[in-house]
Design a protein with these regions (language model features):
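Assembly/oligomerization scaffold segments
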Residues: 1-245
Length: 245
């Protein structure tokens, strides 16, 4: 039986919204699987093994006695939690500096190649990342093969330090962005990866074709134009990961 509908009835919307997200990067997953992690003193709730388990965020917004981390707004949770990452034991002082800088280190049984490194800090609290990171890599003989000092400006911190044939990488955290805080690292990538979403993609064209006789299956093609207003990509003199574009 047919159901009568009004002329204005529309079973399908005239406009569909589709959001595209894509990643571009060079990451060595086998490095995370074989890395042997050590660190400076860590807090009682810290879990060092979680920095290389591919889970790159905290499972909750946890309350502590650190500065402004016991906010009575109903959003905070109590420890323990399933995903807490690595947390340094000492807190920074009034000036945001440590008496002794906390650190993370990873050693490998075989040589590794990484185009760079990515540190993922706690994104449940605003500005909850270190002021400065000193990254140093070493070869099989313990000789330093590269070092770079960087200054995080967000929870996802990319370190452009190409490192071939290294056996050990050391991250030293110099101070916190907010005084009286710990350093929290949710994840470490042995490589660099950039993510593009609706905020960084200016246009997208999707092309699909169909063979009416089903003799072949054509591949769909996607052309995306990214927002390069921050000049990360320079066509004449590309640097960093964009050398691979």
């Amino acid at each position: 039986m047919m159901v009568s509908t009004s002329p204005t009835y529309a079973p399908y919307t005239d406009l569909r919204q589709v959001e595209l997200v894509f990643d571009f990067g060079v990451v060595a997953p086998e490095a995370a699987q074989s890395a042997q992690a050590t660190s400076s003193a860590q807090s009682s709730v810290s879990n060092l093994s979680q920095v290389t388990d591919d889970v790159e965020e905290m499972s909750g917004k946890y309350t502590t006695l650190e500065h402004n981390m016991w906010v009575l707004d109903g959003t905070m949770e109590f420890y323990p939690g399933s995903q807490v990452g690595w947390q340094s034991d000492p807190l920074s002082g009034d000036d945001g500096n440590f008496t002794s800088n906390p650190w993370l280190e990873f050693q490998f049984a075989a040589n590794q190649d990484s185009y760079g490194f990515t540190l993922i800090f706690d994104n449940t609290q605003p500005n909850n990342y270190p002021k400065e990171v000193i990254t140093t890599v070493y070869d099989l003989n313990g000789d330093q093969t590269g070092t770079l000092t960087t200054y995080p400006d967000g929870y996802m911190h990319v370190i452009n330090l190409p490192s071939p044939d290294y056996r050990r990488v050391h991250f030293e955290f110099v101070g916190t962005n907010i005084p009286h805080r710990r350093v929290r690292v949710c994840g470490v990538r042995f490589g660099i990866q950039y993510s593009y979403n609706a905020k960084s993609i200016s246009s997208v064209t999707i092309r699909q074709s169909v063979n009416p006789w089903a003799e072949s299956l054509a591949s769909a093609e996607v052309d995306a134009t990214i927002d390069n207003s921050d000049q990360l990509y320079n066509m004449i003199n590309p640097e960093g990961l964009y050398l691979y574009l």
